[in-house]
């Protein structure tokens, strides 16, 4: 797999940066140069800061949770001074406990020694989304990527949530979405990941995913919710990073994203930020609709243990 980016800009208050110390240490252990930009008043314009750099590979803004993904960042990618595109991510500071949980999760993913390429294909049980999932599975197979098809026709919600605890590097959902979660699987909400349904056993140890991409409408929107689904996943420790839309999206744009993501993973993209840079469609609306949440350098490699756990997941198809 390709080498990870090596220069990260972290914009945060001193209190937030202190809560992320475990992740900062993990970045530095992975030879990432972490540049800290502290602020105390207004949230800085991260896109402008990135535009002043020539060598920056990624940026993460951590600011107060009263800000929303759709207004605090303009897009998941911005250009630095030399014209190269750089992934920028957002993380809401709601409380130190959730930041500590995120930092521990992202640090764990950073320290994993996974070098296998694998993806969990998730999707709503509707023909157009199942066709996209089948196309992604074919692209993954052609590119030497192990694809696990855990779509709504093949697995129940509770089994899918349990399967995502195997620790694969990447999960990719296609279907309808809402600010509170996925419409597929009879509705998936953030609380389902830590509140198992009565009478259903769940694996005792969950391993976080590298990144979960929701290629659908509004999962990063704050409309009528205190915290969007895309923001909740990293804060709950489900994944080191997530990717979701702040508004409505076009099925054609989401399909282009899906195809691009599978092609980029097959071509060797090793972090979620690198994946998005390689996979981004040419359409400005396809890019500007989405936001990256969490660690922009989250590794996408899967280790052998996680791969074996995923292979044991039972499906109906």
Regions found by a protein language model. Name each.
Residues 2-6, 23-143:
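Structured catalytic cores of large enzymes
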Residues 5-6, 44, 114-119, 143-145, ...:
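Loop/turn elements at helix/coil->beta-strand transitions in domains of secreted/extracellular proteins
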Residues 10-15, 50-53, 63, 121-127, ...:
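Structural motif
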Residues 16-25, 129-137, 226, 230, ...:
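Short, highly selective alpha-helical patches that border small-molecule cofactor pockets
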Residues 35-41, 147-155, 246-247:
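Short beta->alpha junction loops
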Residues 66-112, 174, 179-257:
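Catalytic cores of nucleophile-dependent amide-cleaving enzymes
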Residues 126-166:
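Extracellular/periplasmic Venus flytrap/periplasmic-binding protein
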Residues 215, 219-317:
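Active-site-proximal C-terminal subdomain of hydrolase catalytic domains
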């Amino acid at each position: 797999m390709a080498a990870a980016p090596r220069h990260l800009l972290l914009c945060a208050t001193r209190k937030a940066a202190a809560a992320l110390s475990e992740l900062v240490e993990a970045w530095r252990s992975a030879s990432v140069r972490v540049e800290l930009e502290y602020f105390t008043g207004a949230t800085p314009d991260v896109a402008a800061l990135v535009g002043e750099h020539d060598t920056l590979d990624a940026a993460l803004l951590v600011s107060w949770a009263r800000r929303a993904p759709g207004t605090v960042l303009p897009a998941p990618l911005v250009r630095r001074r030399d014209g190269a595109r750089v992934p920028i991510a957002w993380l809401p500071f709601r409380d130190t406990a959730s930041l500590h949980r995120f930092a521990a999760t992202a640090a764990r993913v950073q320290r994993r020694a996974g070098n296998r390429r694998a993806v969990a294909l998730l999707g709503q049980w509707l023909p157009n989304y199942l066709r996209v999932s089948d196309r992604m599975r074919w692209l993954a197979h052609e590119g030497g990527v192990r694809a696990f098809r855990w779509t709504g026709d093949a697995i129940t919600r509770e089994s899918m949530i349990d399967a995502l605890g195997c620790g694969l590097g990447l999960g990719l959902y296609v279907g309808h979405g809402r600010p509170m979660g996925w419409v597929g699987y009879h509705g998936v909400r953030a609380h389902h990941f830590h509140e198992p349904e009565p009478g259903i056993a769940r694996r005792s140890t969950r391993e976080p995913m590298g990144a979960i991409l929701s290629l659908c409408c509004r999962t990063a929107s704050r409309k009528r919710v205190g915290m969007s689904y895309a923001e909740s996943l990293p804060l709950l420790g489900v994944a080191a990073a997530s990717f979701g839309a702040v508004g409505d999206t076009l099925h054609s744009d989401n399909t282009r994203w899906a195809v691009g993501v599978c092609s980029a993973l097959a071509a060797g993209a090793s972090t979620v930020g690198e994946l998005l840079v390689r996979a981004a469609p040419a359409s400005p609306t396809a890019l500007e609709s989405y936001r990256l949440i969490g660690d922009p350098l989250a590794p996408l490699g899967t280790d052998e243990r996680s791969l074996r756990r995923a292979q044991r997941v039972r499906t109906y198809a």
